[in-house]
Design a protein with these regions (language model features):
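Non-catalytic beta/alpha edge segments that cap or flank active sites
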Residues: 1-218
């Protein structure tokens, strides 16, 4: 489900509820037209998971690659729409990936580094996606770490995403993910479930392109 972390135990009721995905985006959601400006994006993908950081998964980290794959798919769809209208494009020219434990200082340290806050005059990523640690487990502290890093909160963004996702899977409403701005970087918390990641990004990516445009270009 959308808010279920990959670390969640499989012996509880919530973990046994199958993820329901009837389409790539909820029927009630209509993506806004892409911004009419060329965008070249630097993306950070941060997996927050004790077990992934310890290398305990036989398959390796799944949620981080799910973020990258969904981003690539969504950007392709949006660029198809853009080229048909005005010829502008949004390109991902750099992707950084990392895995940290569910520890506030580790999460904060990586976020601040990617925001360019660890060097004088350093430029950061355009968007950072975290995946994992947004649920109700005592170790789910990604939103708390994010709030200690961001300078301006954009809580309405993830509230909207959660509401749209809940129209497909009601348990998506249990996600505590937030979003905000640190310098010129937008940070957004995604769930740790790979399917939930895709569902959220179907909604989030079209909105974030406008957010980046406003933040970087006014």
């Amino acid at each position: 489900m959308c808010c279920e972390d990959v670390d969640a135990p499989q012996n509880n009721v919530a973990a046994r509820v199958p993820f329901t995905r009837t389409g790539s985006i909820p029927r009630v959601f209509r993506p806004p037209p892409p911004p009419r400006i060329d965008l070249s994006l630097k993306i950070g993908i941060l997996t927050v998971s004790d077990r992934a950081a310890a290398g305990e998964y036989e398959t390796g980290d799944l949620s981080g690659p799910a973020v990258e794959n969904s981003l690539t798919s969504n950007m392709g769809k949006l660029n198809s729409r853009r080229s048909q209208s005005d010829g502008t494009t949004a390109m991902i020219n750099f992707v950084a990936k990392a895995i940290v434990r569910d520890e506030i200082e580790e999460i904060k340290g990586q976020l601040l580094s990617w925001c360019g806050k660890d060097r004088v005059g350093g430029s950061g990523m355009d968007i950072i996606f975290t995946t994992g640690g947004t649920g109700f487990s005592p170790r789910d502290i990604t939103p708390e770490a994010t709030l200690e890093v961001i300078e301006r909160e954009c809580s309405g963004l993830m509230s909207f995403v959660a509401a749209e996702c809940a129209s497909i899977q009601p348990l998506a409403a249990l996600s505590r993910g937030t979003a905000g701005i640190c310098g010129t970087t937008i940070i957004a918390n995604l769930p740790g479930n790979p399917n939930g990641v895709g569902q959220c990004l179907d909604i989030l990516v079209p909105l974030l392109l406008h957010a980046v445009k406003d933040l970087k270009h006014g």
